[in-house]
Amino acid sequence: MDGDYSERLSQENERYQDGESCILESASAFAHRVLEEIEALAGTTSCKAVQLVRLKKWAQDQGCWYDDRSQFGDFFDRGSENEVYLSLDQNEIIKLNDFRYSDDNLTSFFERIKAHNKYFPDCAYRMTGLAENRDGKVCAVLVQPFISDARLATEEEIHDEFIRLGFRPEDNGEFYTNGQHDIFDAVDGNVLVDDEGHLFFIDTIIYESGTGGIDTYNSLSPRANSKGKKQ
């Protein structure tokens, strides 16, 4: 990709702040059109692989495909779905999300990111493009602020914050719901607290309520599978 990474982030942030059509919305709309095409032609909504191929070409055509991962900064961590980098200025976390928790199409991914930004605006995601991770998988490039000088939240703090936000625990606290969205994986390693007591939900899994999210999560999550083996 042409241009300096920090310059692209700055430009994308300006577009985001100005309320213009951001990459997240554009990519979501494009993926939805692919879904509609496949459903009309083949009568199925199982089209994740096709969507990823088409999204890569779309990103290349739109100038938001990253060829060089070194632009993201220093490799930081690898989770179940994210390859994580710390930006060169150490102000942002860049996640290459491989769409693991989208089952047969990408609809739930885009719904999830939009829901995250609604509930947790202090650590909202910006989608700045797409790239391949170290395993060669097509990924969304997601940018979050880096939360420095923070500690891990306790289970009680996480519970209290969800109650404050209008959520209730389900399945013995395995996830929280407000009837519109179900939020999984809000455990201490994914929720931080700053020195003023503010909680930051930096990495959760969200599904629209009533769409079988718990089954999808349990089938795809290493954490859930690990619990199942111990029982």
Question: What do the PLM-derived regions correspond to, one by one?
Answer:
Residues M1-F72:
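Juxta-kinase regulatory segment immediately upstream of eukaryotic protein kinase catalytic domains
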Residues Y101-E111, L152-E157, G210-G213:
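Active-site-adjacent loop/helix micro-motif of nuclease/hydrolase catalytic cores
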Residues E92, A140-L142, D182, F200:
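Protein kinase-like catalytic core scaffold
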Residues D98, K114-G173:
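Conserved structural core of kinase catalytic domains
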Residues T45-K48, R69-D122:
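ATP-binding glycine-rich loop module of kinase domains
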Residues Y176-Q231:
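Catalytic activation segment of kinase domains across protein kinase-like and atypical kinase folds
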Residues L86-S87, F146, V193:
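Conserved hydrophobic "DFG−1" position in protein kinase catalytic cores
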Residues I93-R100, P145-I147, D203-I205:
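Active-site ExK catalytic segment of metal-dependent nucleases
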